[in-house]
């Protein structure tokens, strides 16, 4: 729901840009009014935050509560101003993407600590292992999102330039932006190889999980 609200408010602020970059696919301003898009944002965001706060309350997790309250604000300011700045806009949206796996890690961590004794959890590195793997997934999600957002900026250069958005292609040009994109791709591939050699090859996660549940 929070992501849906983020898409709605992004389209609300991007009506002029979308009119230039993708006039045939524009929804806000043609299919629905900006006022309707604003209401969609308010309603879906409110539902998402309330559901998130309910889950946070049930799990007694302040970290989850903070994330559910912070994310809508980041998405709003991203759409209103941050996306018009080089690097910062892409960083914000990639951070929000990377938070999705972290939510799962935090929730599962709370469940494990609630249902198992601290002594049992200390006998195996189950929680650190789960957090390490989830952070790995979040890192890959972050880099992939940076790649995606950079490609989108390159596709939207014309409309962004006409509306005075200082995205990477507008500030540095398409040629230099391509090299930034290539660096993200090389980093992603390098981390993928390193992760396989360091973690996946010996199936350490599965061994840790088996050891943990054998102690029950």
Regions found by a protein language model. Give the residues of each.
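Acidic (Asp/Glu-rich) catalytic motifs at the cytosolic membrane interface
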Residues: 1-28, 36, 144-168
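C-terminal membrane-associated helical module and adjoining short loops/tails
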Residues: 45, 80, 98-101, 111-216
């Amino acid at each position: 729901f929070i992501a849906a609200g983020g898409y709605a408010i992004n389209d609300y602020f991007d009506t002029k840009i979308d009119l230039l970059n993708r006039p045939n696919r524009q929804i806000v301003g043609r299919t629905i009014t900006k006022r309707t898009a604003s209401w969609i944002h308010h309603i879906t965001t409110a539902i998402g935050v309330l559901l998130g706060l309910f889950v946070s309350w049930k799990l007694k997790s302040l970290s989850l509560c903070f994330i559910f309250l912070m994310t809508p604000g980041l998405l709003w300011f991203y759409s209103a101003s941050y996306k018009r700045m080089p690097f910062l806009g892409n960083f914000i949206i990639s951070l929000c993407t990377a938070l999705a796996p972290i939510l799962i890690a935090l929730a599962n961590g709370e469940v494990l600590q609630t249902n198992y004794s601290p002594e049992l959890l200390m006998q195996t590195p189950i929680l650190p292992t789960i957090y390490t793997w989830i952070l790995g997934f979040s890192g890959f999600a972050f880099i992939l999102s940076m790649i995606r957002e950079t490609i989108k900026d390159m596709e939207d250069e014309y409309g962004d330039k006409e509306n005075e958005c200082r995205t990477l292609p507008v500030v540095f040009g398409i040629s230099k932006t391509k090299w930034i994109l290539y660096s993200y791709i090389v980093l992603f591939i390098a981390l993928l190889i390193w992760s396989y050699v360091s973690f996946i090859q010996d199936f350490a996660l599965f061994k840790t999980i088996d050891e943990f549940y054998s102690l029950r």
